[in-house]
């Protein structure tokens, strides 16, 4: 078995990255409209500000492949510490979309839980933008990005305040969060884009930034995640590439494809996996304590808030009984009303079951197992490609007759 050449290995690695992250190649007609920057049109959009009257105005963010790679590499270089950078792009009002064409890192001081931009970072930002315009890059800053190493893509309280301030003074602005640890574990870029609601605004939709889909949040971050989950909303994220992006990606993968084959996510991400297992054990211990401390048999299993919910249900029944008594028994249950009440009760129990501690722990365990399987499959595939050299039979030996045993 012949080992694959370096060029074919680089092509396979790049193709795998593009497939996992659903990167859309642009056609020649679309290419001109996206990369052509109309300064006057952008100024007119900034003057009109249609997003001021609709907090949900922007629905999508489209990120170029080169900008995505730069942000992921920057996030990965930070290790356990958060990083921060800015993104340049333009506005598409017709499609309610923000385009991210490029990104650049900021020299900031980051910790394991927060990142702070100092005066040096602001000076660097101004100089970078000035030099960009000197070389013909007229795109304005359309957002900022930072990393959450190991704890998912969402906005903390500090992030919400930062994003809200940016939207107040230099809107349109979008916040992008990348988790480099989960990116390595899953093989797909773990990324989220968010915009905050104005202060005091109450969304008519029950879906906030924290409720768009289930996320595995560490126990130490759950409180911060839940408190601010309804103060922002997620945007759909798409990735695209041009022919020039393709050439740049070729150069990048020709340089780094060996690292893809020589490294294993099981080894490079072992600290993250260990922390996830420890967090899962803490969640299960907390769940077990909640079960042991249940005071009522009617409480939903494994739910710390089930007692309060059952009180609300019981109170609702008492109110209904009192209403029927006061009305002289005229408000009798009809079959349609009974069915509707039963359906509502079933839906409420399903919601409580999904939000229960044991359900979340089960989802976290399934996610950990899936990521471990991904790492094992990658290691097995590499072993099969480069170590199992099965001998190919020669034509002479292949054509030789098989002796017949009597």
UniProtKB/Swiss-Prot annotation:
One of its GO terms (molecular function) is metallopeptidase activity. Pfam families: CSN5_C, JAB. Its EC number is 3.4.-.-. Zn(2+) binds at residues 146, 148, 159. A motif (JAMM motif) lies at residues 146-159. The keyword Cytoplasm applies. PROSITE patterns: MPN. GO terms for biological process: protein deneddylation; proteolysis; regulation of cell cycle. Residues 320-341 are annotated as: Disordered. CDD domains: MPN_RPN11_CSN5. Gene3D superfamilies: Cytidine Deaminase, domain 2. The keyword Transport does not apply. GO terms for cellular component: COP9 signalosome; cytoplasm. It is found in: Cytoplasm; Nucleus. Belongs to the peptidase M67A family. CSN5 subfamily. This is COP9 signalosome complex subunit 5. It comes from Mycosarcoma maydis. The lineage of its organism: Eukaryota, Fungi, Dikarya, Basidiomycota, Ustilaginomycotina.
């Amino acid at each position: 078995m012949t080992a694959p050449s370096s060029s074919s290995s680089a092509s396979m690695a790049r193709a795998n990255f593009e497939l996992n992250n659903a990167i859309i190649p642009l056609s020649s007609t679309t290419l001109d409209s996206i990369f052509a920057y109309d300064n006057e049109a952008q100024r007119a959009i900034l003057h009109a500000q249609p997003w001021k009257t609709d907090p949900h105005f922007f629905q999508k963010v489209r990120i170029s492949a080169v900008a995505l790679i730069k942000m992921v590499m920057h996030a990965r270089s930070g290790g356990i510490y958060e990083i921060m950078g800015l993104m340049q792009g333009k506005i598409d009002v017709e499609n309610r979309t923000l385009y991210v064409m490029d990104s650049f890192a900021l020299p900031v001081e980051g910790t394991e839980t927060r990142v702070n931009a100092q005066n040096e970072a602001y000076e660097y930002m101004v100089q970078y933008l000035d030099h960009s315009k000197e070389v013909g890059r007229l795109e304005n800053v359309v957002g900022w990005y930072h990393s959450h190493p190991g704890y998912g893509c969402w906005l903390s309280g500090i992030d919400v305040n930062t994003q809200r301030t940016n939207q107040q003074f230099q809107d349109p602005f979008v916040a992008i969060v990348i988790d480099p640890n989960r990116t390595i574990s899953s093989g797909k870029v773990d990324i989220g884009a968010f915009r905050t609601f104005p202060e005091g605004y109450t969304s008519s939709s029950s879906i906030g930034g924290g409720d768009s889909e289930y996320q595995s949040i560490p126990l130490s971050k759950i409180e911060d995640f839940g408190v601010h989950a309804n103060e922002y909303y997620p945007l759909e994220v798409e990735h695209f590439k041009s022919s020039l992006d393709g050439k740049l990606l070729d150069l990048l993968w020709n340089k780094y494809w060996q690292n893809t084959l020589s490294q294993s996510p099981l080894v490079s991400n072992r600290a993250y996996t260990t922390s996830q297992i420890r967090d899962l054990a803490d969640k299960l211990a907390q769940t077990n304590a909640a079960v042991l401390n249940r005071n009522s048999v009617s409480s939903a299993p494994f739910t710390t808030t089930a007692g309060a919910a059952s009180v609300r249900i019981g109170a609702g029944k008492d109110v209904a009984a009192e209403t029927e008594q006061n009305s002289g028994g005229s408000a009798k249950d009809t079959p349609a009303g009974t069915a509707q009440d039963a359906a509502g009760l079933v839906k409420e129990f399903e919601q409580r079951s999904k939000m229960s501690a044991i359900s979340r722990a089960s989802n976290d365990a399934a996610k950990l197992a899936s990521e471990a399987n991904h790492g094992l499959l990658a290691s097995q595939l590499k072993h099969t490609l480069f170590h199992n050299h099965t001998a190919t039979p020669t034509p002479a030996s292949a054509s030789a007759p098989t002796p017949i045993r009597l």
